[in-house]
């Protein structure tokens, strides 16, 4: 083959390679600009396409600066609840602000969802299992889809949710200022009876019987048997109440979270909560939170009938055998919760 022909063939091959390289580069440039103009879509846990959160309205904006000019009845209701907390804190400032500065340990009940800019203070015996399930769905990045598929014991594993005390002080302050903060409350004595029934009348709660039952029986029961002192599994409600109002109890250690006051768990006189949900309107209030977070179209609060739920009628029965003196002392322990969340004094109480 002649040298001139070989040279022509070699040049053609080089030209084709250069053309292919240029074409590939051009395609990459086009793809880059398209990605800049159209952000990559991600899928929420239920398979609904939603764009990245950046640029959308935050829950705080949805709550305090709604698109519609006229506030809804729900928004007005929650404003009244916020005002009730503020007024109670102001009226009881000497009691409610004994501690001016919170420590990180005070924030361990505040669960953080960075994706949706939410902070939830969980209160045991106020639907906290289902709300922890919801927070796991919201923060799970696709790991979970149906809240009710998450086992109850898994919802209470601390490693599954991030709490505010795990952040630095500047990060804590930023989130308290920028995120929507909410909690759920319940009539204080109904919550207390619910805690007693769950922790002291169920045979499987051996750890509570050993940890608290034995101590309560030793302190409150005269002529207790050795078996009762050893097992602690037959604590009477009257003994439980006597333990709670005993001044020595909280001097020894703080109340367990299941019967600790909401005021002490969530510090509403130090932290401004944007929403106060109530157990009595649980489904409605929960779905309002989800709506403000921008997930209400595909995520709802789980509903199911629980036949073992503690009711007002049950609570009335439990308090029948409590003396008026002990009822009065117990009310003083939970008084701030009654006032702050606008619960009236129960009609069954015989206060001195």
Swiss-Prot record:
Q: Where does 3'-phosphoadenylyl sulfate bind?
A: 124-130, 186-194
Free-text description of this protein's post-translational modifications in UniProt: N-glycosylated; required for activity and stability.
Q: Kindly give the Pfam families that the UniProt entry links to this protein.
A: Sulfotransfer_2
Tell me the Gene Ontology biological-process terms attached to this UniProt entry.
apoptotic process; carbohydrate biosynthetic process; chondrocyte development; chondroitin sulfate proteoglycan biosynthetic process; developmental growth; embryonic digit morphogenesis; embryonic viscerocranium morphogenesis; in utero embryonic development
The record, for InterPro entries, names: Carb_sulfotrans_8-10 (IPR018011), Sulfotransferase (IPR005331)
Record keywords, A-Z: Carbohydrate metabolism, Chromosomal rearrangement, Disease variant, Dwarfism, Glycoprotein, Golgi apparatus, Membrane, Signal-anchor, Transferase, Transmembrane, Transmembrane helix
**Superkingdom per UniProt:** Eukaryota
Q: Which residues form a coiled coil?
A: none
What residues form the membrane-spanning segments?
A: 17-37
Q: Which reaction does it catalyse?
A: chondroitin beta-D-glucuronate + n 3'-phosphoadenylyl sulfate = chondroitin 4'-sulfate + n adenosine 3',5'-bisphosphate + n H(+)
Q: What is its EC number?
A: 2.8.2.5
Regions of this protein lying in the Lumenal compartment: 38-352
One CC-aspect GO term? Golgi membrane
- Biological role stated in the UniProt entry: Catalyzes the transfer of sulfate to position 4 of the N-acetylgalactosamine (GalNAc) residue of chondroitin. Chondroitin sulfate constitutes the predominant proteoglycan present in cartilage and is distributed on the surfaces of many cells and extracellular matrices. Can also sulfate Gal residues in desulfated dermatan sulfate. Preferentially sulfates in GlcA->GalNAc unit than in IdoA->GalNAc unit. Does not form 4, 6-di-O-sulfated GalNAc when chondroitin sulfate C is used as an acceptor.
Entry protein name: Carbohydrate sulfotransferase 11
- Provide the species name: Homo sapiens
